[in-house]
Amino acid sequence: MANPEFYGLSTTTLSGQPFPFKDLEGKAVLIVNVASKCGFTPQYKGLEELYQQYKDRGLVILGFPCNQFGGQEPGDASAIGEFCQRNFGVTFPIMEKSDVNGNDANPVFKYLKSQKKQFMMEMIKWNFEKFLVDKSGQVVARFSSMATPASLAPEIEKVLNA
């Protein structure tokens, strides 16, 4: 059964367009807080490779730029979009820059964190934490920044084959 809490969420794309999560019903979703000036930034390449490998089977990857960790996403929407395209050829959707922790955290991350804690804590610890959501909208896994995109393939396969 579809999860109304997850599919009731919405956000805004980097270009300012509404992005209702109801459009994600029936898809596997990988949600990542991203940054342009982080030691983990090269993960964009692996995320794009995952997207190309699995998008036709129903995987959507959503990147959420965040400047809360070391000020590593200082740019505006146009600078972020240009960086992602020029350096990594990113074609998966990038959302508007937002906080992932604290009172002003994006509601998407408030929800994700409430569903999957990391080491008994809800707080996002750094850029490039990842949440995997199954085709019915259930948060099934959370991965640290250290988890490479390629290492997620077995979990993504499980979700896509379910």
From Swiss-Prot:
The keyword Cytoplasm applies. It is an enzyme of class 1 (oxidoreductase). It catalyses: 2 glutathione + H2O2 = glutathione disulfide + 2 H2O; a hydroperoxide + [thioredoxin]-dithiol = an alcohol + [thioredoxin]-disulfide + H2O. Keywords: Cytoplasm, Detoxification, Oxidoreductase, Peroxidase, Selenium, Selenocysteine. GO terms for cellular component: cytoplasm. Its EC number is 1.11.1.24, 1.11.1.9. InterPro entries: Glutathione_peroxidase, GPX_AS, GPX_CS, Thioredoxin-like_sf, Thioredoxin_domain. It comes from the Eukaryota. S-selanylation may increase or be important for glutathione peroxidase activity. The active site is at residue 87. One of its GO terms (biological process) is cellular oxidant detoxification. Pfam families: GSHPx. PANTHER family: GLUTATHIONE PEROXIDASE (PTHR11592:SF78). Two alternative-length transcripts are expressed that differ in their stress-dependent induction. The longer product may function during photooxidative stress. It was speculated that the longer product is directed to chloroplasts, but this is not observed during nitrogen replete or deplete conditions. Has thioredoxin peroxidase activity. May also have glutathione peroxidase activity, although this activity is controversial. Protects cells against reactive oxygen species, which may include photooxidative stress, hydrogen peroxide and organic hydroperoxides. Belongs to the glutathione peroxidase family. This is Glutathione peroxidase-like peroxiredoxin GPX5. It comes from Chlamydomonas reinhardtii.
